[in-house]
Amino acid sequence: MADLAELWEKVSSNKDSKSLLKKHLTKEVYEKLKDKKTKFGGTLADCIRSGAKNLDSGVGVYASDPEAYTVFQDLLGPVILDYHKITELKHPACDFGDLSNLGFGDFDPSGDWIVSTRVRVGRSHASFGFPPTLNKEQRVEMQRVTQGALEGLTGELKGKYYPLEGMTPDVQKQLTEDHFLFNDSDRFLKAASGYDDWPTGRGIFFNDNKTFLVWVNEEDHIRIISMQKGGDLAAVYKRLVGGIKELEKKLEFARLPNLGYLTFCPSNLGTTLRASVHIKIPKVAKKPEFKEICDKLNLQARGIHGEHTESVGGVYDISNKRRMGLSEIEAIQEMRKGVEEIIKLEKAA
């Protein structure tokens, strides 16, 4: 309790924090939740630790485990509504659309604008906690279960699993050059126990073509990524959905009817789907109203090296903004229409 009282003191006494934690963890909510515990052993302290230690956080709240979304709903509910800009905690059933009739293919057959296309989702095991409530043995066990499912993949998805622990320098160098490797450098995740027991239990799986990639125990239990050079969104999306469906046969993923798929950070909930292109748009990006254009199309633009980075040579990472309150196929269609509009504007500029 001393730990929690200290964290609460940090958050409540800070006048400058703009985080959603600061905004929604009122004295009343704190008093109501401070003694509660999830079946995974998760506490309010686990949920707010990162935001209290990093008062410049945007969100500042992580879920201690899948059950935290129910037990600590008085804090997490308002944070979710606020972050996702929705009016009620409601999410449709999972719907990937009719894969044989998507109505779209390659955005950019000429190859003039789109450098690469990528779609990812996050998934959590229903029976394991999130980083704050896991111990070393559980991390190892979760990796074992996930690795078993991944190594059973066949056809185009067939590949190899590389644990981070004991990885040779050669493999490490190759994966870093491929931009496949994740590291332990995010201070927000670190404060949220995201890197406890690092690198135990973490690893990377990818297929022979390096177009299907799975991160194990990075931020989320599982991040499934499909990607390739060029603009063939349909091929990338179908591969991703195929991979998800195969893994679902062997693993049970955490989901709530009103929130969709559960993730460690409430910002990824819902479809958890982020569809993005690296796209050359030097002219549109120079327009003073560029951000406004993206907002109107429900797109997010950032530099190609991830969040908070600048563009290199007019190449931007453009992705769908909305994760909650719409289905997977709706999220993909929204991104497709938005990117088509951006290409049209670039051509006309």
Curated annotation (Swiss-Prot):
Its EC number is 2.7.3.3
Q: Which of the seven top EC classes does this enzyme belong to? A: transferase
Q: Which residues form the Phosphagen kinase N-terminal domain?
A: 3-85
Catalytic reaction equation(s): L-arginine + ATP = N(omega)-phospho-L-arginine + ADP + H(+)
Which GO terms label this protein's molecular function in UniProt?
arginine kinase activity; ATP binding; creatine kinase activity
Q: One GO term of the cellular component aspect?
A: extracellular space
What the entry lists under Gene3D superfamilies is as follows: ATP:guanido phosphotransferase, N-terminal domain, Glutamine synthetase/guanido kinase, catalytic domain
Name the residues that bind substrate. Answer: 58-62, 219, 265, 307
Report residues binding ATP.
116-120, 179, 223, 274-278, 302-307
- What's the family? Belongs to the ATP:guanido phosphotransferase family.
Specify the protein name. Answer: Arginine kinase
